[in-house]
Amino acid sequence: MSTNGVMEKGFVTTSLDSVINWGRTGSMWPMTFGLACCAVEMMQAGASRYDLDRFGIVFRPSPRQSDVMIVAGTLCNKMAPALRKVYDQMAEPRWVISMGSCANGGGYYHYSYSVVRGCDRIVPVDIYVPGCPPTAEALLYGIIQLQNKIHRTNTIAR
């Protein structure tokens, strides 16, 4: 959290936006939307080696308790309405991470009749994590980039 003022007589001045965004970045709760092999790497990121809990990231089973959705894997036309429904059930503010080349743009199955060519055609995506499948480190880097994006937003002006 950045301080905009100087410390005088035991207090620090800062903006309310900075405090709210600091709280949001320290308690991101992702809704997992694992569709293919990228979901295995997402599960690995939550395991003890990478331990996303230390960043305040706790996977939630319900979209109503989540503020981040991680779309991992190939999105088919049949699954697209379910993705949109889960996204609409999430409370504002909400963010989406697209994980893997299949979620980003269709991947190997780009020319298949049943594959959506990127989940950004269904929901707005904030962070794209490339790779097939992306490593747990790449997902962790994407989450850190999302935290940086949240720090830069104006919360109260929305």
UniProtKB/Swiss-Prot annotation:
Binding-site residues for [4Fe-4S] cluster, renumbered to this chain: 37-38, 102, 132
Key word NAD present: yes
GO CC annotation terms, alphabetical: plasma membrane; respiratory chain complex I
Molecular function terms, GO-annotated: 4 iron, 4 sulfur cluster binding; iron ion binding; NADH dehydrogenase (ubiquinone) activity; NADH:ubiquinone reductase (non-electrogenic) activity; quinone binding
Gene Ontology terms: biological process: aerobic respiration; electron transport coupled proton transport
PROSITE patterns: COMPLEX1_20K
Catalytic activity, reaction form: a quinone + NADH + 5 H(+)(in) = a quinol + NAD(+) + 4 H(+)(out)
Membrane topology, from the record: Peripheral membrane protein
The entry's keywords: 4Fe-4S, Cell inner membrane, Cell membrane, Iron, Iron-sulfur, Membrane, Metal-binding, NAD, Quinone, Translocase, Transport, Ubiquinone
Similarity comment: Belongs to the complex I 20 kDa subunit family.
Role this protein plays: NDH-1 shuttles electrons from NADH, via FMN and iron-sulfur (Fe-S) centers, to quinones in the respiratory chain. Couples the redox reaction to proton translocation (for every two electrons transferred, four hydrogen ions are translocated across the cytoplasmic membrane), and thus conserves the redox energy in a proton gradient.
Protein name as annotated: NADH-quinone oxidoreductase subunit B 2
Organism: Nitrosospira multiformis (strain ATCC 25196 / NCIMB 11849 / C 71)
